[in-house]
Design a protein with these regions (language model features):
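Conserved alpha-helix/loop element of class I SAM-dependent methyltransferases that forms part
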Residues: 42-62, 75
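A short acidic, Gly/Pro-enriched loop at the edge of an enzyme's catalytic core
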Residues: 120-132
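Conserved beta-strand signature within the Rossmann-like core of class I S-adenosyl-L-methionine
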Residues: 160-167
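A short glycine-rich, Lys/Arg-flanked "PGG" loop and its adjoining helix->strand segment in the class I
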Residues: 147-159
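A generic alpha-to-beta junction signature in SAM-dependent methyltransferases
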Residues: 58-60, 84, 157
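N-terminal, positively charged/glycine-rich alpha-helical extensions of SAM-dependent methyltransferases
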Residues: 1-34
Length: 168
């Protein structure tokens, strides 16, 4: 049995388990990669700059609903919750990533709604969000999954809403 098959549970896509189990699904790697020096090294020293640019474009309109597609290592989610007073919905297919996000947002959890779901097939209503935020997601996706995510974003973002993509 291949090692990655141990991670094929709870709706985890095959490509994620096969190619990225070591980075996003294994508890020891989740702990390892969520250290600022590691994240900054992966991003060639640009993490803080990219985070600041992302936060500068986050929706601040009172009453807006934001969706952050997938958890990410680092401080995006807690920073986003401190930056805006809006409700932030955060979804990820990986339970370990959601647990990590929950631990980082305890002090602002009244505005953070966590949900376990695949970004390729969101369980949200049409036109549910004023802004959808993607922080380093697309480079991890195979082309067909990427297209499904594009389609889902178009479905859940309100007319006149925005999509904020930070990528390298």
């Amino acid at each position: 049995m291949r090692l990655y098959k141990r991670f094929l549970k709870g709706g985890v896509p095959e490509y994620l388990a096969r190619y990225y189990w070591w980075a996003y699904l294994w508890e020891k790697s989740i702990w390892f990669f969520d250290h600022q020096p590691v994240i900054n090294a992966i991003l060639f020293g640009q993490y803080d700059r990219l985070l600041e640019k992302t936060l500068a474009h986050a929706e601040e309109k009172p009453g807006a609903k934001l969706l952050q597609l997938t958890c990410v290592y680092g401080k995006l989610t807690p920073s986003l919750l401190r930056h805006t007073s809006n409700e932030v919905h955060l979804c990820d297919v990986a339970a370990g990533q959601l647990n990590l996000a929950r631990s980082k947002t305890l002090d602002v959890s009244d505005r953070c709604r966590l949900a376990r779901m695949n970004a390729e097939s969101l369980g949200y209503a049409n036109d549910a969000f004023d802004q959808v935020i993607l922080f380093f997601l697309f480079h991890e996706l195979p082309p067909d999954a990427r297209q499904h995510v594009y389609d889902e974003i178009a479905r859940v973002v309100k007319a006149g809403g925005s999509v904020l993509i930070t990528e390298y």
